[in-house]
Amino acid sequence: MHPNPAFRAEDRTRHINFARDRAFGVLALSTDDAPLISHVPFLLSSDGSMVELHLVRSNPILRTLTAPRAGRIAVSGPDGYISPDWYGLADQVPTWNYVAVHLTGRIEKRPQAELRGLLDRQSAFYEERLLPKPAWTADKMSPDALDRMLRMIVPCRMYVDDIQGTWKLNQNKPDEAREAAAERVEGGLGVELGWLATLMRDA
């Protein structure tokens, strides 16, 4: 998380809504040898207290979960390079704007009996965004194929103790300079630059 308090929004609801909508992040656990990292889709509860996810059975993280372990999920949003020329101000330096939320807590394996319900909820969450396409459901799979797939993955849950977010959107610049940079960022370098420009204008 960025140390500048101008970028460290304390709006927990905003962090939760962003992470819930994004529903994809980087799960990290510490070990004696090296951090273990996995990119995971997930479901976050409406109050931000619980994350549900699944991991493929061969994932090294699962081998460490003989008991609940401390973990963190980093959820990234849009990001982009900001040229100092865009501000219309003297003596500026390049920077990179971005949005990120970190969910920290204890992660554990869950009983295999919970997996089908989790997968149904996850697929429903994502399929709803594809409307008016008819929703895919696991019922479209043959029982044998579904059973083979279910044996390959394991349900997990993280109980969230802390949520922190960085919304680095040039809030430390005058409104006119931030607006000017937002106008230019869409043609620049980064990811989801249209979204980033909108967030900068609203900062």
What are these regions (language model features)?
Residues 57-121:
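Short, structured beta-strand-loop surface elements
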Residues 108-203:
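C-terminal edge-of-domain segments
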Residues 16, 91-92, 145-148:
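A generic local secondary-structure boundary/capping motif
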Residues 21-57, 73:
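Short beta-strand segments
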Residues 2-26:
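Short, basic/aromatic recognition patches
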Residues 29, 55, 75-77, 160-162, ...:
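Pocket-edge structural micro-motifs
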Residues 52, 72, 102-104, 155-159:
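Beta-strand secondary-structure signal
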Residues 21, 36, 47, 67, ...:
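A short, structural micro-pattern
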